[in-house]
């Protein structure tokens, strides 16, 4: 049987990186990060000028960290270096230039397809960030899940955990 990952994270931005590192440190050893760009943190790389500040708070929202991956204010360069170090130190398997075309659940596994490969996982987290374009499902999200499914953080409230 092909390799089955404990977790595949789609999206190599700060949230996706934190997710795979947290998962690995929590005991999920077989994790994979898939990113459509040629490296992680595409928004920071493409749209932040050199030496631009990168702050952990967004629009004045408190960003208390509840995991083991810390995030501090810094510059574009120090932030990218920090994420490089996290991926290297944890030996995270990451594939770049790997845009996900589909995610389908069959039995107990998710089948994740890119243009160049197919992967299987017990769990999938979609963390596509600002530049991602999710294909929202054509079915209604059950109301019981509305508090854990979010396509936009523009309206998050002060103190809300996301």
For each feature predicted by the language model, list its residue ranges:
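Short beta-strand "acidic-cap" motif of Rossmann-like dinucleotide-binding folds
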Residues: 29-36, 44, 126
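Short glycine-/acidic-enriched loop or helix-start segments at secondary-structure transitions
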Residues: 19, 43-44, 105, 135-137
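N-terminal Rossmann-like dinucleotide/flavin-binding domain of flavoprotein oxidoreductases
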Residues: 45-117
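Active-site acidic short loop of glycosyltransferases
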Residues: 4-5, 121-122, 159
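Glycine-rich dinucleotide-binding loop and its adjacent helix/turn
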Residues: 1, 128-162
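Short hydrophobic core segments
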Residues: 8-10, 34, 112, 118-132
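Conserved Rossmann-like nucleotide-cofactor binding loop
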Residues: 15, 39, 131
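N-terminal Rossmann-like FAD-binding beta1-loop-alpha1 element of flavoenzymes
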Residues: 2-33, 162
